[in-house]
Every structure is written in structure tokens, then in C-alpha cells.
Amino acid sequence: MSFSSDTKNELVKIKDHSAAVCLAELMGAVAFGGKIRREGGTMVLRTVTENPKVARRIYQLMRDAVGITSKIVIKKTSGTTAYYQVCAENEDAITLMISLGFITKPSDMNYFSSFSVNTAYLDKPVKKKAFLRGAFLSCGSVMNPEKKYHMEFAVPTYGLHNDLFSVMTSLSLKPKVVVRKGTMVVYFKSSEDIADILTLMGAYNILMRFHNVKIIKEIRNDANRTANCEMANLRKMVDASVVQVQAIEKLIRLNKFNTLPENLKEVARLRLEYREHTLKELGEMLTPPLGKSGVNHRLRKIQEIADKY
């Protein structure tokens, strides 16, 4: 099961304390997943989802917060995907639309064209959070953080995009928007933003999983950076050692080695014998011991002498 499905499966278990909060969540779910159709003489409001638990949640919200009895219809495509439609018909559909603030009177259905959010229903932060939860259940998704940080809401209309954007910014979120195949996509790529949304929606178990993955990724990235840094330092040390050995061998080849002062010859002999040792390790082998900078100074002096020939 996907990380996104796990998130929705946790959200549908949340128990709200008031009808107003339930209405706010239902408003989000219906606005972003609902469609009005007239089929023969029947008017049907369908809220569509691929998740059966989300369909059950919407059914329960309609029953408990609005007092209507809807039905769940399962539609299967040519493949293995099934769609669950929570259907409210005729008077129940009108009651639902009025209860959620999409229309004010039954006759408004004759002119209804698209959903828009009545912000008067979202006058408190707790209602906005519930609305955000409902919107996510209908049109949201979040990627497994092990792969990448990405959460998005695929919004069906430009007007709803504005509504969702407004609610999000009022909750101090900073969404970004892109148009993908004619659909407005409100998205987040920051791990901090995604964690904030999970918190606002009430997905606390998923939030813990998200943070655990983030911590592991950060530890792994830190380890990789450290390893890369150590490898780079090792390459520098090896490169320097090669140059030093070449300078010493040049002096030996030209019979100039014995002209070096004894302190330089001592370091040169150690470098030839211990080519993979660090400057610090070479210095500890000298009598008396010499610090890293002192060894480096002597080897540079040898290189300068070799460069003259």
C-alpha cells in the first residue's frame, strides 16, 4: 500500500467533536471530488474516490453531519482499478448542497455550474484544518519520503484552486502552483511544509513515520558527505605524496640527493619508504618528532630544490 493511501487511511479514522467540523471536512471532500449530473429525471451528486475507506468516510459524514442517506456505487475500469462513487440523489443532493454552502436555495440548482467554497463556513482554524483534510481525501496525494518530498492537490477548477490557496495561506502554509494537463496542481516540496500539513490534518502516526524517514535520510546524507570529504582529502594527500616522491626520485636520479641538508634527507627517506603515510604520521617517526607543518615545510623545500634542475 502506498504512503499516500496510508495517510488517507489514518485520516478517515479521525473522530471530530462537532457537526460544524464534520461539515467543513465534507465540504472539502465534495468540492474537490464531487460532480453534479442529471440522469433522466434524477439529479445525482457523486463524490468519487479510488479509496474504499475514503468513500465510507464520506458516506458517514453525509449521514451524521447532514442527515441524508447516500449510497456507494463501485465502478470498475478495464484494468484492475475500481472507483467508488458516493451518490446523493434529488432532495438529498439539494439538502447536501445547501448544508455545505454551495447553494442557498433549491432553485439555485438550475443555474449551478461549478463548486466554490463558502468561507463563512470556515471561520475557525479547526474548520479550515478539517476542510484541508477533506480536500486531501478527494484530490490529494503524498509521495513516500524515502523517494522524494512531494505533496500535491490536483484541483479540478481554477476557482477551487483560489479557494484552496486562500485557506492554505491563512494557515501559514506556502503552496506552489503548476498547471499539468489542464489541471491546477497545488503542491509542496519542502519537508517542513509537508510535515506542517500532516500535522494540520491530524495524521500524527504518518507524521512520525515521515520524521523517522527524514532523520534516516539526513544521517545517510551526512555520512555520504563525510565520506566524500574524506575521499577528497585522501586524493589530495595521495596527489601531494606522488609529487613529493617524484621530486625526491629526480634528485636521486641526478645525483643531487646527497647535497641536501641532513634534515631534508631524513624526511625524504621516510617519504620514499612510507608513501601512503600522512604528514602527521611522518613527523611522529622523526627524531625528535616534528609537527605536520614542519614536515610539510621540509617537503616543499625539497620540491623547490628539485624544480631548479
Q: Which positions does each model-derived feature cover?
A:
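Short, Lys/Arg-enriched C-terminal cap helix and immediately downstream tail that follows
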Residues: 304-309
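Conserved phosphate/pyrophosphate-binding and hydrolysis machinery centered on Walker-type P-loop NTPases
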Residues: 48, 125, 154, 187, ...
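DNA-contacting interfaces and partner/effector-binding or oligomerization modules
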Residues: 56, 60-80, 87-211
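N-terminal low-complexity or simple alpha-helical regulatory segments
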Residues: 1-99, 120
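Short acidic, hydrophobic short linear motifs in intrinsically disordered regions
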Residues: 36-44, 146-148, 278-280
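Short helix-coil junctions and helix-kink-helix linkers
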Residues: 47-49, 152-155, 285-290
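Extended mid-to-C-terminal alpha-helical interaction segments
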Residues: 200-297, 302
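Short, hydrophobic/amphipathic alpha-helical patches that form generic packing surfaces
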Residues: 24-32, 130-138, 269
